[in-house]
Swiss-Prot record:
Alphabetical list of PANTHER family matching this protein: NAD KINASE
Compartments where located: Cytoplasm
This protein's name: NAD kinase
Function recorded in the entry: Involved in the regulation of the intracellular balance of NAD and NADP, and is a key enzyme in the biosynthesis of NADP. Catalyzes specifically the phosphorylation on 2'-hydroxyl of the adenosine moiety of NAD to yield NADP.
Gene Ontology BP terms: NAD metabolic process; NADP biosynthetic process
Reactions listed under catalytic activity: NAD(+) + ATP = ADP + NADP(+) + H(+)
Root EC class: transferase
Coiled-coil ranges from the UniProt annotation: none
Species of the source: Staphylococcus saprophyticus subsp. saprophyticus (strain ATCC 15305 / DSM 20229 / NCIMB 8711 / NCTC 7292 / S-41)
Pfam entry (one): NAD_kinase_C
One cellular component (GO) term of this entry: cytoplasm
Amino acid sequence: MRYTILSKGDSKSNALKHKMINHMKDFQMVEDPDNPEIVISVGGDGTLLQAFHQYSYMLSRCAFVGIHTGHLGFYADWLPHEVEKLIIEINNSEFQVIEYPLLEIIVRYNDNGYETRHLALNEATMKTENGSTLVVDVNIRGNQFERFRGDGLCISTPSGSTAYNKALGGALIHPSLEAMQIAEIASINNRVFRTVGSPLVLPKHHTCLITPVNQDTILTTIDHVSIKHKNVNAIQYRVANEKIRFARFRPFPFWKRVHDSFISSGDDE
């Protein structure tokens, strides 16, 4: 089995990474950061997001597993004291592969049709660089839907619906559903300006095209990465054809994670 390990970079995570590498030598597992079959992140959900972006070019050929050295995460489901068990499972087991939907973002510029393509595991947001009101036309499936005015828009995946989207009042969506969700960030609603005022859930075959009305510099975030764009013509969002693959060696139910993260006090029986 070819593997690679990405660490959060703190002392605890780095020590655990080196411990795992030494232990994996006993199983004749090969460390191969260029062509891994399994990508192990040690840290938290942020570390796994970084691992996803680093290996997004080979999603069909590798699977991800997370070890959390801090708080319980939605993606990192193994504890530091379980690493030896995990290594044995990786070496001996045919692991189950669970696939989650991703978000495709295509930024189109006014410069001779130039465009860039990105993938997000959690969400993408769109705002103005200087914090002024974002004014954009929202087009769904080729039809004008609304003119949005506000701080910005957040477009999330099902697994990302528990992150920024939840803080914006969006719905929680099970990752088995291939969909994306659009949530407003502080929209302006009065007698003159109106938006739908509710999160929108779009299925896989629906595309959302967002066109800036003014030529402001647009600030986008794609998971943990912030990018400034000038001279933007439009940004297209849809459910990506690619999916992220997680290696599962034991059950890790989505709704239990939601309960443990947002409801459980730690004292539940």
